[in-house]
């Protein structure tokens, strides 16, 4: 049997020899792995499909949403292949189930006066009926999708103005569409209020700025943005179908929920807000609606194990704190709740079920925290813990605890990293060579490229795909132009992608295979680390911190300058000092020894940094005033580098020339 599997496993390699860039079919080992999943999980439980359809008011026959410039912001037609329910051997059956559930889009009634539009973006948008208008919780990613959701609600439920916008937390898929619902003038006049958890603006901006370019490039892997939709491509994103495309917007909150939370009455509707900082977002809050006995758990309890560490990159989240906040919600609200819903996936009804889900999600994050550290305290390292830790059956067999978004594997490593860091304690790993420097030596020790490939192909034929990608990665980094190595690496990554239950893992594996076969798509549009709204909302100190990240240390070597910067429209002064190839900024300080003093409104500084206007034009218009050496600010800006979005990931990074 094992020999037959090996021969069948080699068939995709041989069949694909004529067209090496095309996706390969699932191997016999992958098919066998999918059958094991079907046997191990409770697929007879179809209750989630009833939940995901419950309360449906309207499901548009064709969902295609365009941005104002005519580009496609969102469409679901590419996922029609899922609708026949036929098992696909190139998709993990558990992930395929989640992918089909996330296709349940449209306008739904959750409870009396509470409605959700689901499937118009990665997240859900919630409309709560007030005395005179709508209270909206979360605004999707981009104005086009938010506007389309609001138009659907208006058609089906009647036209009503929006009185309040609530941001549940500080991630872009929950605030980026706000300008599709309300105008800045409505907020400025007080006609619309915006409510958010304490720390919202700092969290919304800071998390995505300083390392924003790297995060967004890595997000192309996690979300599979380069992949075609299909059985051998992108099928889902666990908490939704994928990312909407279009500009982000951001309007600052007019009221923050402070402390542990607050009780408010909004347009006649009573709300209780529970702040949960440091859970799924640095600033996040659950919402209790006592009139309907409805509990909105933000993104703290959704239809999957969530990320303690997200593959795009971010600070590691606090598993223990997350567990404790769920426990608080359970005891404050959960034992009264008759409906529980969230900003992703579908609701749940009935108190007994709600209590059980809250308990098991609480214990899911608590178990990951405690048992990871239990192993760590026995000497298990960050390179081992993901192969040791397993969930108990009472958690593992619940669909909402499965690892579609987070995974036990990468979450366990995240917990260990949060407490002990990346170093495993073994001095052999304390000061490693860079992969591109060690790769050639590994290949030499293994007998050269041909011998390595010969053995790797044999491992591939045995279905040892994890081992193949570990070994062949060395050869790809030693010889990035070795076509045979790239093809074998892509084939092995692809099989891992087909087998992955986790949507981010699948997308990452398949994106890596795509780039190994086709190269990095440098001609594709790039994602921006910040929009004009984001820049305007950014604290000035953070703005200058970001300029420090952009500083080209080589260009700044040996240079020293100091600039007094005055921002009269916001009443702030900063001292900028460049020394030792580092840019310092200090608020509220001016130096008599500064080489230049510049006065410019913060709004005009934003325009200058966005390259909407030149410094010469601002001087001519009297909007930039300077004394001392007039060249220093220009010299400083001339040392700022721009980041290449499409940097290499699965091959050695190109050497910088500067």
From Swiss-Prot:
Q: Where do the annotations place Zn(2+) 1 binding?
A: 169, 171, 280, 299
Pfam families assigned? Alkyl_sulf_C, Alkyl_sulf_dimr, Lactamase_B
* InterPro entries, A to Z: Alkyl/aryl-sulf_dimr_sf (IPR038536), Alkyl_sulf_C (IPR029229), Alkyl_sulf_dimr (IPR029228), Bact_Alkyl/Aryl-Sulfatase (IPR052195), Bds1/SdsA1_MBL-fold (IPR044097), Metallo-B-lactamas (IPR001279), RibonucZ/Hydroxyglut_hydro (IPR036866), SCP2_sterol-bd_dom_sf (IPR036527)
What note does UniProt attach to the cofactor annotation?
Binds 2 Zn(2+) ions per subunit.
The subunit structure is: Homodimer.
Give the gene name.
sdsA1
Say where the protein is mainly found: periplasm
Q: Name one GO cellular component term.
A: outer membrane-bounded periplasmic space
Give GO terms for biological process.
dodecyl sulfate metabolic process
* Signal peptide range in chain numbering: 1-17
Copy out the induction comment.
Up-regulated in mucin minimal medium.
Name of the featured protein = Linear primary-alkylsulfatase
Q: Which organism is it from?
A: Pseudomonas aeruginosa (strain ATCC 15692 / DSM 22644 / CIP 104116 / JCM 14847 / LMG 12228 / 1C / PRS 101 / PAO1)
The record lists the catalysed reaction(s) as: a primary linear alkyl sulfate ester + H2O = a primary alcohol + sulfate + H(+)
Subcellular location per the Swiss-Prot or TrEMBL entry: Periplasm
User: SUPFAM superfamilies given for it?
Assistant: Metallo-hydrolase/oxidoreductase (SSF56281), SCP-like (SSF55718)
* Cofactor(s) required, per the database record: Zn(2+)
Q: What happens when the gene is disrupted?
A: Insertion mutant cannot grow with SDS as a sole carbon and/or sulfur source. Disruption of the gene leads to a decrease in the growth in mucin minimal medium and a reduction in the degradation of both carbohydrate and protein moieties in mucin. Mutant shows reduced swimming, swarming and twitching motilities and decreased mucin gel penetration ability. Virulence of the mutant is attenuated in leukopenic mice compared with the wild-type strain.
Residues bound to Zn(2+) 2: 173-174, 299, 344
Family to which this protein belongs: Belongs to the metallo-beta-lactamase superfamily. Type III sulfatase family.
Q: What does this protein do?
A: Alkylsulfatase that cleaves both short and medium-length alkylsulfates, including the widely used detergent sodium dodecyl sulfate (SDS). Acts in vitro on primary alkylsulfates such as decyl sulfate, octyl sulfate and hexyl sulfate, but not on sulfated sugars and arylsulfates. The hydrolysis of SDS allows the bacterium to use SDS as a sole carbon or sulfur source. In addition, contributes to the in vivo virulence of P.aeruginosa by playing a central role in the degradation of mucin, a glycoprotein that is the primary component of the mucus overlaying the host epithelial tissues.
Q: Where does sulfate bind?
A: 307-312, 317, 405
Q: What class of enzyme is it?
A: hydrolase
